Amino acid sequence: MLKFRIRPVRHIRCYKRHAYFLRYNHTTTPAQKLQAQIEQIPLENYRNFSIVAHVDHGKSTLSDRLLEITHVIDPNARNKQVLDKLEVERERGITIKAQTCSMFYKDKRTGKNYLLHLIDTPGHVDFRGEVSRSYASCGGAILLVDASQGIQAQTVANFYLAFSLGLKLIPVINKIDLNFTDVKQVKDQIVNNFELPEEDIIGVSAKTGLNVEELLLPAIIDRIPPPTGRPDKPFRALLVDSWYDAYLGAVLLVNIVDGSVRKNDKVICAQTKEKYEVKDIGIMYPDRTSTGTLKTGQVGYLVLGMKDSKEAKIGDTIMHLSKVNETEVLPGFEEQKPMVFVGAFPADGIEFKAMDDDMSRLVLNDRSVTLERETSNALGQGWRLGFLGSLHASVFRERLEKEYGSKLIITQPTVPYLVEFTDGKKKLITNPDEFPDGATKRVNVAAFHEPFIEAVMTLPQEYLGSVIRLCDSNRGEQIDITYLNTNGQVMLKYYLPLSHLVDDFFGKLKSVSRGFASLDYEDAGYRISDVVKLQLLVNGNAIDALSRVLHKSEVERVGREWVKKFKEYVKSQLYEVVIQARANNKIIARETIKARRKDVLQKLHASDVSRRKKLLAKQKEGKKHMKTVGNIQINQEAYQAFLRR
């Protein structure tokens, strides 16, 4: 029989040489140390802020310097775009998903400790919903302007959004270390356009760290107010963003507005009414660091076991299940609606099942994408995808190709048209093939409504004429022209149809301005418009995947371009192929591919005239029969080439 002897406590000293024993019993984990630091910092020493900037003005670089100075990351040359987690974010130099990081900072002037939450927001208008939720979690923002470029369209749009939400703004001019910059001129732009005091403007170099610790961090502490939440109130949190983890499900980025929440608490989402248990909770430092609790004013993450990102609705309120009746839902929730739709089909039709799985996984990580299966008579099985904008669609396609190696045929982007019927009913059309065409289908239609946007463009004055002509040719309506400074920068405002914006308007704008123009826009509602469906026909059969909805004034020009372009990619057949463009049951353009001729006379003697005529007549009849019953073989490469810009 085995006997066990329990050693007295005094014998523990003989294990001192075993480091692991001491660590296990006497030291705390890094997460516990962080939580202990947080507990010692009062709410009035919290500062939640974001950085407002145009693309390439140095937002990610400044974020890196702040993380280095506050010892979140080690200072080294590899720290580039730490908060940009996605490969496509790093390559394009843009922020797509909102991110956050907690920082601990000791003010050298007073010796007080502060908890800073940097909320890195997307800057592009496609992700404006995420931007507004991120700003709602902040007390202030750094308005970052490039000293070499000055104020740009995105700077203006995001400034007004932050200003409208009541954020305290700190104007900062970046890249002051460059020799060719005119800091005084940029200061004048900020003062004149945003009416911010010149003495409040701080000059920094995000790349070298110049003035970041000396001037910017003290300004964040002095000028940005602490969170206004109440720790004694019932818990409620604002859902800022989410991303999908294969093991955890949806990970939620939240701002704790009131109260506190702990691991294992039972919570409920106000919009979906779904109930959950908190599986994990913590801060981003800069990656997920579990702390076991979050309290008023903090920005961190929650894992609730959501299996689908669609359950995580941006702007939703999360509350304690036991105190639902005592808790007021946070205002301002608005469901995000897709504004750009495309048809997507596998470049190789046999890959549909595998690609369907890849597509579903990627959609799990982006709850703003809508996904429906559809079938095309030309391209086979595919999907109808809805996006927040053209950049959103481009990023999704790039991620699908890079992360999963999937190749797609993407149809021409379309926008949602509103059809108003004579009986007062309305229908939103997102697929051009479903758009009413011809006199019979349009007889019950009272009006068609087309979405418009208000575009803000900044550009050098020398390109003003070219840009105005571009806007006018795209059915634009001028709103305002503002001259930003004596150096020739102009801000131009136009109403434009959304359909023209998604048809590579930004590329055309860059072309006519030699890359110097910038663009931002916001929704301007629907207007009654004279739009029709344009179809491409091959031997009388419409190719559904290539249909488009256009304004009546553009139909003839686009139709002629279509038939000429498609003719280039269709191989000749043994019979004549007719390519036509049709709108309102009327053929507006036509191209013909002549039949490939087979020499049936090569074995005949030259003098056998009757036999010659008989064979030619038989060939003619055969081709006529083939044309009526034959199916034209158009390969996938032809569609890809035609849809390529």
Swiss-Prot record:
Q: Which reaction does it catalyse?
A: GTP + H2O = GDP + phosphate + H(+)
| CDD domains documented for this protein | EF4_II, EF4_III, LepA, lepA_C
Top-level taxon? Eukaryota
What GO biological process terms are annotated to this protein in UniProt? positive regulation of translation; translation
Where this protein primarily resides, as one coarse class? mitochondrion
Q: Which InterPro entries match?
A: EF-4, EFG_III/V, EFG_V-like, EFTu-like_2, G_TR_CS, LepA_C_sf, LepA_CTD, LepA_IV
Keywords of the record, alphabetical order, are: GTP-binding, Hydrolase, Membrane, Mitochondrion, Mitochondrion inner membrane, Nucleotide-binding, Protein biosynthesis
Q: What range(s) does the tr-type G domain occupy?
A: 44-228
Q: How does it sit in the membrane?
A: Peripheral membrane protein
Q: Where in the cell is it found?
A: Mitochondrion inner membrane
Enzyme kind, highest EC tier = hydrolase
For this UniProt entry, the molecular function terms from Gene Ontology, in alphabetical order, are:
GTP binding; GTPase activity; mitochondrial ribosome binding
Positions of GTP binding = 53-60, 120-124, 174-177
- Report the EC number(s), separated by commas if there are several: 3.6.5.-
- Which Gene Ontology cellular component terms are annotated? mitochondrial inner membrane; mitochondrial matrix; mitochondrion; nucleus
Function (record text):
Promotes mitochondrial protein synthesis. May act as a fidelity factor of the translation reaction, by catalyzing a one-codon backward translocation of tRNAs on improperly translocated ribosomes. Binds to mitochondrial ribosomes in a GTP-dependent manner.
The UniProt similarity line reads: Belongs to the TRAFAC class translation factor GTPase superfamily. Classic translation factor GTPase family. LepA subfamily.
What NCBIfam families does the database record attribute to this sequence?
A: lepA, small_GTP
> What more does the entry say?
Present with 1890 molecules/cell in log phase SD medium.
- According to UniProt, the name of this protein is Translation factor GUF1, mitochondrial
Task: Tell me the lineage of the source organism.
Answer: Eukaryota, Fungi, Dikarya, Ascomycota, Saccharomycotina
